Swiss-Prot record:
It comes from Psychromonas ingrahamii (strain DSM 17664 / CCUG 51855 / 37). The gene is pdxB. It comes from the Bacteria. Homodimer. Substrate binds at residues 45, 67, 258. Its main location: cytoplasm. This is Erythronate-4-phosphate dehydrogenase. One of its GO terms (biological process) is pyridoxine biosynthetic process.
Amino acid sequence: MNIYIDENIPYARDFFTGHGNLHFFSGRNASAEQLIDADVLLVRSITEVNEKLLSLNKKLKFVGTATIGTDHIDQTYLKNRGIVFSSAPGCNKVSVAEYILSSLLVLADQQQFILSDKSIAIVGAGNTGTAVYQRLNALGMNCKLYDPPLLLAGDKRQFCTFEEVLEADIISLHVPKVVQGPFPTVHMFDSKVLSQLTNGQILLNAARGDLIDNQALLELAEQGLTPTLVLDVWENEPHINQQLLPYVAIATPHIAGYSLDGRVRGTEMLYQALCDFLQLKGKYTTADFVHRAAINSVSISKKIDQPLIKSLMHLIFDVRRDDALFREMIEDVDGFDTMRKTYQERRELSTLTVESSVEQNTLLQLLGFSTNVQNEIKETHEI
């Protein structure tokens, strides 16, 4: 059995060795000729899996994507050919939520505001949007959810209108790319919508680049008419409009979901799905391969406030590191993909155990940290 695997799916060799002949390929440059003898195809979001890519292959049985999003997969075509498909829903929701949290803590420090004084509209209330909501709600923010498809499907949570989205202090996008249907998301934020936003607002996009009309955004930015921008995703990746970069407060190359834990979680989900398809019992889990974080415990004696949360957060992940590196690497023609391919290891907050009082542990847990009651950890860093 020939298993073709995107070369940037982490720990794939460890998980899949023994299940067939492993062939690793560049996901950005996959071709029909290259995949002609694949029985299993494992990809990421950069590979469009459709009739064109699979036109020469007559034996493919299983396609998997190590991502939450599936808009790069022609599922109708796969179904018509009898090819089993699997994705990794929720695999990197924590990673994206922590990217948003780090970004907002940085901006709050720079602009001198308290997050609990702000309202945030979370556009998209699926796995990732919900993870963002849980963390920011724990910080006391006025969180609003906008998701018409979920509302129509009977979701019992309270949802806001799009008008209310545009009135929020902060807007964070977490919807898939939808081209057609009653609720398309491509250019959801077009020139008309963007022109309704103000300099006092913050707009974050860690979902899909096509949600925002980047050219319209640039034209407004050149006039000084945009909110503070945090962009992890861009139109026309990897060949983004670099003229937009100077106007973006925090800019990164589609790495919000790139924590080691989240990426390996996606690999494990594909591994388990393939084992189920082959009617085999899986032997491995993420814990078999991922080591402890370099900084894995800390003790705090002070009362938790926003600066302390920022300090704890940035022991694990500080988005400013990625922003600075991206602005440097994007000067190279292949810089966007190079940074993603060589992305420095980043862990999730759960890998850090915070020793604190019982009273403070609930908030820490809601933010994603592991916790222990004071004095239960012997070897810790102290803040």
